[in-house]
Amino acid sequence: MLSSGTICSLLLLSMLWMDMAMAGSSFLSPEHQKAQQRKESKKPPAKLQPRALEGWLHPEDRGQAEETEEELEIRFNAPFDVGIKLSGAQYQQHGRALGKFLQDILWEEVKEAPADK
């Protein structure tokens, strides 16, 4: 008779062979493909919420305050595009750190440019 190791090996190989056969059957069998689509459609799509800024949790509330407050938009192109929108209060709070960050990035670019030529 066959040893238990041989039997386990044959079982493992047959299971792997079945998995390979099932993977290839979706192309040939439209029913298997439909079953896979049904399984995927059961999961509801995830809703993405914007991050809360300064305690604003709902976008509906944000629209009212934005009408009264002016926004500042900063855009510049370097080797990459950067765009930032800030309200007046956010600019007052983070303006100095943002300025230092941009200055560091831009001065790095200027210092590296002559070395490349």
Swiss-Prot record:
It comes from the Eukaryota. GO terms for molecular function: ghrelin receptor binding; growth hormone-releasing hormone activity; hormone activity; protein tyrosine kinase activator activity. It is found in: Secreted. Residues 1-23 form the signal peptide. Residues 52-75, 99-117 form a propeptide. One of its GO terms (cellular component) is cytoplasm. A lipid is attached at S26 (O-octanoyl serine). One of its GO terms (biological process) is positive regulation of synapse assembly. Residues 28-69 are annotated as: Disordered. Residues 31-43 have a biased composition (Basic and acidic residues). O-octanoylated by GOAT/MBOAT4. O-octanoylation or O-decanoylation is essential for ghrelin activity. The O-decanoylated form ghrelin-C10 differs in the length of the carbon backbone of the carboxylic acid bound to Ser-26. Amidation of Leu-98 is essential for obestatin activity. The modification Leucine amide is found at L98. InterPro entries: Motilin_assoc, Motilin_ghrelin, Preproghrelin. Mainly expressed in the gastrointestinal tract with higher levels in the stomach, medium levels in the duodenum, jejunum, ileum and colon. Low expression in the testis and brain. Not detected in the salivary gland, pancreas, liver and lung. Coiled coil: none annotated. Keywords: Amidation, Hormone, Lipoprotein, Secreted, Signal. The keyword Lipoprotein applies. A lipid is attached at S26 (O-hexanoyl serine). A lipid is attached at S26 (O-decanoyl serine). Belongs to the motilin family. This is Appetite-regulating hormone. It comes from Mus musculus. The gene is Ghrl.
